[in-house]
Amino acid sequence: MKAAVHFLALAALMATGSTFASCDRNSDVSTESNVPVLDVKSEVTSFALGANLTGALPPSPPATPSEADMLTYMKEEEKLAKDVYTTLNAKWNVQIFTNIANAEATHINAVVGLMEHLGLSNTALLPVGEFQNPEFTILYNQLVAQGSISLAEAYKVGALIEDKDIFDVSTDMQNTSNASILLVFDNLKRASGNHLRAFTKQLTALGTTYTPQFIDQTTYAQIIATPMEQGKQYRKINGQ
């Protein structure tokens, strides 16, 4: 399992200073409909769950050991985002943290659904601020402390989390050929990009900026310059 050490170090340093991609379906177009799985509203990007997500996932082999580690880590990373945003909302009472925390809950459920689809059972979630990987517990405490300094620092914490999510998902997508993982992770990446745009917009309104710590500056600039991503719709056979 990948370490969160670099993420932890950056947090300490700071403290000191829609829809899914298409799946090919060989069926008559007259029997199909466009089905959204990634739901983009304003600055918040959620997964439409249940039958929509299940229908989008293609048949896939069971997860390999490395893919199991990848998914377990991503489940914890998405939970970190939700837990930090929930706690920072209690501190600052600003709508963006409420909205994005709710969106992150759907991201967690999407990863859990993916894990179950691939035959994994370690899908349990601990209470807010508690994680199976103790490094995430340490990181949660550091990020909450940093985000409690000021509203600007809270938005920078949000940007850092989304920055790391984009980097990790992009890396993971290069290390798997599993179609279901690629489908979900592509849209986690889109969602994190949308949330990074949202936090950057809030920072700009406060007259400050965020410097990316994981993705490179060129990638960050491209994300910020791009409109909110809606993704592609997949085709679902009516009645299924």
Regions found by a protein language model. Give the residues of each.
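Bacterial Sec-dependent N-terminal signal peptides
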Residues: 1-7, 13-57
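All-alpha RGS (Regulator of G-protein Signaling) helical domain and cognate RGS-like helical scaffolds
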Residues: 36-240
